[in-house]
Amino acid sequence: MPPIFHRNLTIPELVQWALKLEKDSRLTARGALAVLSYAKTGRSPTDKRIVDTDDVHNNVDWGSVNIKLSEDSFARVKKLAKDFLDTCEHLFVVDCFAGHDERYRLKVRVITTRPYHALFMRSMLIVPKPEELARFGEPDYVIYNAGECKADPSIPGVTSTTCVALNFKTCEQVILGTEYAGEMKKGILTVMFELMPRMNHLCMHASANVGKRGDVTVFFGVSGTGKTTLSADPHRSLIGDDEHVWTDRGVFNIEGGCYAKAIGLNPKTEKEIYDAVRFGAVAENCVLEKTTGEIDFYDESICKNTRVAYPLSHIEGALSKAVAGHPKNIIFLTNDAFGVMPPVARLTSAQAMFWFVIGYTANVPGVEAGNTRTARPVFSSCFGGPFLVRHATFYGEQLADKMKQHNSRVWLLNTGYAGGRADRGAKRMPLRVTRAIIDAIHDGSLDQEEYEVYPGWGLHIPKHVANVPAHLLNPRKAWKDVKQFNDTSKELVEMFQQSFNARFAAKASQEMKSAVPRYVEVSRL
């Protein structure tokens, strides 16, 4: 028998089907749908493939991020997925838009076996109004999510039982061997990183909000640096938490929802996100209390990458039409585990390009007794390395052009550690300190402060910020041992230089190269 197609179901209908068909799906105490993605609890970057076609061959930065797949192999991957989908009893179809700016939006169709995936994408994308759905017609882009079916490693270019393949020519994505929902939303982001530069628009892995005076702030950052938390501000309207485009008119959100890390979610300090996890939301790989059905946001027994997905409408004050003006402030978020970065610095144009393409953050090891792992840097180009299609310096120059054109201020904000290394017991920057800095950026007072230059790094550090302890502002003053500070600073500078020289130096402008940090020893703290 052919599959039964369930097209564009409502939230209650999708929840009902999930509870009926998915043995491990259940409702939380507050009505969110708790689901499991099983074996894969995160993206599979080594299994992502870009189809090598004539129209994109010269634009793609081929390598370990964008791995080639031939058109013939893609046809076989797609056939495997469609043949599997044809055997399923139930298929769920979601027709939605990607992009709040109607001039650039894509009509996206998702075909999947799991109601959870349909509900997820119904939140992640923009749900058409009834009249828009009536004239939706053929989609611009189709996602075939056959994640319950394993990929075939005998197909040339496929190296495991997982394959996430994107074809820009046929406007299709095929998913095999992974049920992690994030593959779908990041597929859309990758498509926009290819499409938007054709129109001279900058695609951004970033969150954004807007103040009452129309002042827009964009937050760049890799996963875990605070994009979602910091953009959900009770005094400002949320534009979006993850994927945006900067056009000739301003900023628009690609998505219709948010996908937040759930581990450690605190209802007191992250109330907006906590309150959003209710009926209509998806709680992915979260553990529930057996007796109450409440989510245990500190339980990592399934995975550390627990997630919650919810529509923008769940955030009080979020823009229903997520389009705003040009950014007044751009903030680069870094989770520095070495304790060398200041909590905030104002960047020059050259520094903005450098820090954007280098995309620095750090992986933080556990600090339990007996742990021998050390902190290590992560350099994710443009704070979204896994999703870039073109070379990072291309996007860096795009950003520099736009910030100069619109006089945007660029800031580096460290949400990581101060006074020492994370792997040696240093404490993370308190959220209240980070929020105080952001408040000072938004009210304009931080721009009026007196600044000093951080030796070697060249960063401009304020000498005072309201409600921020003075000893935190200059990193070396928070340390107790000058030798340890010098050794750590030298180690990090060398890793910056090595990463830049290996990945960007050949294509970087002289202006960008001038911002590469150098080591300067300090004699006292």
How does the language model describe each region?
Residues M1-R135:
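N-terminal accessory targeting/assembly segments
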Residues E138-Y141, N145-L195:
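Charged, amphipathic alpha-helical linker segments immediately N-terminal to NTP-binding catalytic cores
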Residues L230:
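Hydrophobic positions on the alpha1 helix immediately C-terminal to the Walker A/P-loop
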Residues H57-W62, N167-E172, R376-C382:
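Gly-rich Lys/Arg/Thr-decorated short loops/hinges at beta-loop-alpha junctions or inter-strand turns
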